[in-house]
Amino acid sequence: MEKEFIMPGYPADLLSNRSIVKRDSFAIITPEGRVINTIPGIVDAKMTILCSPKIGAGFVQLIGTLGANAHTTIPYANLAHEESFIYVLDGTVELEVAVGDEKRVLTQGGYAYAPASVGIGFKNVNGEEGRILLYKQRYVPHPAGLEPYAV
């Protein structure tokens, strides 16, 4: 049996991680298994897709680190059938978030919800780093006709 050569200082499983994806069932993506993606309309942010319809989910969930000039060029999830949510996970970022005509500055623990067709825009206003969670899903009207509102 031939002995496997491993470069000194590198782990034997360099190209693997503990992430598990079972289509139409579940996904566990560990930090070392995350891939940085380019998300249209989001600038200066290292975003990772944690879940999407591509693996069977009924929603899209992103996590990312915002750079000093992070901002959106178009509102995230602004289609007529999409509702969205943003949450500032951690960091010292001051994030100006726009939902329609309303703007607020969010810090760690802050969040905003945008009803369908409105979308969420954001801009890092203090140049500090922070992490965010972005979420969007298809809007399903309430059976009694109640309308959602921005939070």
Show the residue positions of the predicted features.
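A short beta-strand-loop-beta hairpin characteristic of the jelly-roll/cupin
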Residues: 71-108
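A short glycine-rich, His/Asp/Glu-containing loop-to-beta-strand
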Residues: 34-76, 82-83, 151
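N-terminal accessory scaffold of Fe(II)-dependent oxygenases
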Residues: 2-35, 129-133, 142-144
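Short acidic, glycine-rich loop/turn motifs
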Residues: 54, 95-99, 124
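Short, intrinsically disordered, charge-balanced linker/junction segments flanking boundaries
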Residues: 92, 145-151
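Ligand-binding loop in jelly-roll beta-barrel domains
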Residues: 100-110, 116-143
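N-terminal auxiliary "cap/dimerization" subdomain that precedes the catalytic jelly-roll/cupin core
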Residues: 3, 42-44, 68, 89, ...
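Conserved hydrophobic/aromatic beta-strand scaffold that supports enzyme active sites
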Residues: 47-49, 61-65, 85-87, 103-105, ...
